[in-house]
């Protein structure tokens, strides 16, 4: 478990590829530079897609974890 306090939460529970990453892209756009976003997902492909999204766009994936089929991600938006 983590002590991160997110500025926003994206609940993509029940959504399948490509919806979680599409929603993530919109949520990151609305987040202030340096803001922290928590993503909750159930699609196993997010284990691959979200780290690639962060790497490609320069955002920091602070932590990811899995708990009983639920995937959690904490993403810090890059500075502008």
UniProtKB/Swiss-Prot annotation:
Subcellular localization, as worded in the UniProt entry? Cytoplasm
Keyword hit for RNA-binding: no
Catalytic positions? 17 (cysteine persulfide intermediate)
Gene Ontology CC annotation, any one: cytoplasm
Give the keywords, sorted: Cytoplasm
**Signal peptide location:** none
Q: Which Pfam families match?
A: TusA
Q: Which GO terms describe its molecular function?
A: sulfur carrier activity
Primary location recorded for the protein, binned into one broad class: cytoplasm
Name its GO BP terms in alphabetical order.
Answer: tRNA wobble position uridine thiolation
The UniProt entry, under HAMAP family, shows: Thiourid_synth_A
Name the family the entry cites.
Belongs to the sulfur carrier protein TusA family.
The function of this protein is:
Sulfur carrier protein which probably makes part of a sulfur-relay system.
Name of the featured protein: Sulfur carrier protein TusA
Species annotation = Pseudomonas putida (strain GB-1)
Q: Which gene encodes it?
A: tusA
